[in-house]
């Protein structure tokens, strides 16, 4: 089926299950023409279809980012939460400020976790040299704050984010992250988090 036919199928499903199937088929095309329709699906009350749309949009990649930034829905929280997951999955630096705010301030812990983890996935080579150090410091500060989150899954995401960030920063900054994680290891009550910290520390020099 052509992309046009698949788009019409998404817009005219016969059931909730049919919608999920149609979205998955459209997402599998990885066609930029599908972006507006897949983004619209995020506003539907159908988590299965939304997950398929999110995965499809992440697979399309950076071409999705400008459209998403123009269409972030501040009034539809569910759609906004899905969009943040897409930004986190793509790692485009144009969404940095949104991810930083979400990691520390979003009321849903699942969104905070996704944003924190996604901050370790930023494509730093796309950030101008003159801005990179400042932006990386902002991300580092954000993730250090996320380590204090009351929800353990957010702390877990922050550790993954710091581990990812450490692969893109100067050695001196890696030492700062390693020292912070070593300190955090002594106060973290959750065994799963402590194990994740130890894994992250081992990946650092």
From Swiss-Prot:
Record EC number: 4.-.-.-
Protein keywords: Antenna complex, Lyase, Phycobilisome
UniProt key word Lyase: yes
One MF annotation (Gene Ontology) recorded for this entry: lyase activity
Top EC group: lyase
Any one GO CC term of the record: phycobilisome
Oligomer and partners: CpcE and CpcF associate to form a lyase.
UniProt function note: Required for the chromophorylation of the cpcA gene product.
Family per record: Belongs to the CpcE/RpcE/PecE family.
Protein known as: Phycocyanobilin lyase subunit beta
